[in-house]
Amino acid sequence: MKVYLVGGAVRDQLLGREVRERDWVVVGARPEDLKQRGYRPVGQDFPVFLHPETHEEYALARTERKTGRGYHGFAFHASPEVTLEQDLARRDLTINAMARADDGTLIDPYDGRRDLEQRLLRHVSPAFAEDPVRILRLARFAARFQPLGFRVAPETLALCRKMVADGEVDALVPERVWQELSRALLEDTPVPFFRVLRECGALARVLPELDRLFGIPEPEAYHPEGDTGEHTLLALAQSARLGGDLPVRWAVLLHDLGKATTPSQVWPRHPAHEHRGVPLVEALCERLRAPRECRDLARLVCRYHLQAHRAFELRASTLLKLLEGLDLFRRQARLEPFLLACEADARGRLGLEDQPYPQARFLREAYRVAAAVTARPFVQAGFKGRQIAEAVTRERIRALAALQRDYPRPEAH
């Protein structure tokens, strides 16, 4: 029985990156051998065990054989006869198909180290095409390693295009799409994930709502990049730069979906796109089974981002409706994520990436003065039922109007 460190830990060691988790392959052993040593079985589809002390994963060396469409369509075979090289052969990319022996020796049968040095993301074998999730993983690695200068090997991109043409990508289930998508969104540079998917044709199958934005013009006076899809990716890059969490980045990605439904005869304008986008956002979130927090923020940013941008121009009554539409008087925690997404949208324009967003400070102050108006004095004054709500609304509008009168206007940019 021999144990090898495999996969991402070996790759990250060679790149000089922090190793966050370690996975191991055990060659020449049976499940009983590990159980006798106190390892706890956790694998449902194939033999994976947790170390009794470190709780790191140890998997028996295995091979796999394609039996049907999608990532579920595999039969696995684990036995003491399976070699390390056979186990590494089933992995997706050469940079993930290396191992280290306990004496430090590097086992690299598929030239992963060479591809690391050449900054190439290359598939191990034609078996890559058997699992559509690998396209998403490839795109995610392109995002993760973009700062290091990695690119997808041309032959790997060609194989991905063939997978899309063969319909293999259509077998992806929503849970796996969301799992890879959400991980990619949280990378420091998430944009290459979508670039790679678009380049191989997978974006149109996995996220058609997003793919449709490319080629749709925008007014160049406001959007020097001139293309809705490009603006969306620029805004996404800004959301990462500003430190947005997953709900913020997801909301930014979806905020302009409504522009795909604008009749071409009114291009490059997109009147009411914020209204038309809401049902598209809701349907996409439902299809991918996105978490509630992601759904809620995406819907609100889609619906209200234009009002946030125009905050200084709104009437006091409209400003109050914005605060109420965001449900801030009950859910104050929504304010900062909403403002961050709106700032990313405003900065997601070619040449305007460092533009200030004074609307955020103003909207914080607007919420503060409006929230300071409560029902208590009106209840104490004897107001009843609807009278109370009407009085609170009147007083909040009065407070917001006073704020607008006294608040210093920002310089035009």
UniProtKB/Swiss-Prot annotation:
Superkingdom of origin organism: Bacteria
EC number(s) from the headed UniProt entry: 2.7.7.72, 3.1.3.-, 3.1.4.-
Molecular function as annotated in GO: ATP binding; CCA tRNA nucleotidyltransferase activity; cyclic-nucleotide phosphodiesterase activity; magnesium ion binding; phosphatase activity; tRNA binding
Keyword Nucleotide-binding: yes
Binding site for Mg(2+): E21, D23
One BP annotation, GO: RNA repair
Binding site for ATP: G8, R11, R91, R137, R140
Cofactor annotation comment: Magnesium is required for nucleotidyltransferase activity.
HAMAP family: CCA_bact_type1 (MF_01261), CCA_bact_type2 (MF_01262)
Other comment: A single active site specifically recognizes both ATP and CTP and is responsible for their addition.
Function: Catalyzes the addition and repair of the essential 3'-terminal CCA sequence in tRNAs without using a nucleic acid template. Adds these three nucleotides in the order of C, C, and A to the tRNA nucleotide-73, using CTP and ATP as substrates and producing inorganic pyrophosphate. tRNA 3'-terminal CCA addition is required both for tRNA processing and repair. Also involved in tRNA surveillance by mediating tandem CCA addition to generate a CCACCA at the 3' terminus of unstable tRNAs. While stable tRNAs receive only 3'-terminal CCA, unstable tRNAs are marked with CCACCA and rapidly degraded.
Family membership: Belongs to the tRNA nucleotidyltransferase/poly(A) polymerase family. Bacterial CCA-adding enzyme type 1 subfamily.
Descriptive protein name: Multifunctional CCA protein
Organism: Alkalilimnicola ehrlichii (strain ATCC BAA-1101 / DSM 17681 / MLHE-1)
Gene name per UniProt: cca
